[in-house]
Amino acid sequence: MDAEIFAGQVKRLLGAPFVLLADAGVPVCRVAVMGGEGGDDVEAAKAAGADTYLSGRLGYHTMTDAPEGGMNLIEAGHFYTENPVCATLQRMVKEIAPDLACDLFFSGNIRAL
């Protein structure tokens, strides 16, 4: 799959206002995923055989350097890559301790304008 098409689908499915794509010009065949800050693990993803790395935050220099190494990078935002797991964590907490109150909290303080 084309990296730009894949990144667009990631954006749509996560509900992110935008994603950043460093397109290495290679098709998306194997994706490594890390929610939140993932800039330190790009080389590990590449060593594991990924041609595309999706994370919440990668950093400017990581993104500008990676395409030269033949790897597509997609930065989709901390909130948007971590939010999908919150309901799962809530269910796990309730399974461990059914009588424990466990509410989801979403901060709306930061917005892309």
Model-based region annotation:
Residues 1-113:
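Hydrophobic structural segments
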